[in-house]
Amino acid sequence: MAPKKEEKPASQAAEAPEVKAEAKPKAVKAPKKKEKKAPAKKVAKEPSAGGEDGDKKSKKKAKVAKSETYKLYIYKVLKQVHPDTGISSKAMSIMNSFINDIFEKVATEASKLSRYNKKPTVTSREIQTAVRLVLPGELAKHAVSEGTKAVTKFTSA
């Protein structure tokens, strides 16, 4: 854009040297105005820096959300069954891993069943069949009855 400004003063016959002299201070003034705006932007960045702290907090929240565990639920069930019994952190970690493994096995089996039946959706029927295949004997029966009870409660609510 600077060459265009120089072309305009060149088209004006005698005033060209004076305009160039004026153009230079204008060019100097424009960056000064931009410099004044730059600190204002820095001031605007400082509150967003606080927002970045907020972003860091939300990043921490996102990290917490990624590590979903069943620890709270394991503890609640433990207190229902044995109210005076505690559990160590290592045992809690083992139980959490156990639940994740069982969940993965049931989900994988249900996915296979839906593929065998050429259905795109995993329904409660596939889950129920997968539980019967993955869990042994009496445990499968109890899991199916509890699952059926939970689905009935969910659909009625």
Swiss-Prot record:
GO molecular function: DNA binding; protein heterodimerization activity; structural constituent of chromatin
Species whose genome carries this gene: Volvox carteri (Green alga)
UniProt main location, coarse: nucleus
GO cellular component: nucleosome; nucleus
Keywords of this entry: Chromosome, DNA-binding, Isopeptide bond, Nucleosome core, Nucleus, Ubl conjugation
Record cross-link Glycyl lysine isopeptide (Lys-Gly) (interchain with G-Cter in ubiquitin), residues: K153
Keyword Zinc listed: no
UniProt keyword Nucleus, yes or no: yes
Protein name, as recorded: Histone H2B.3
Residues spanning the signal sequence: none
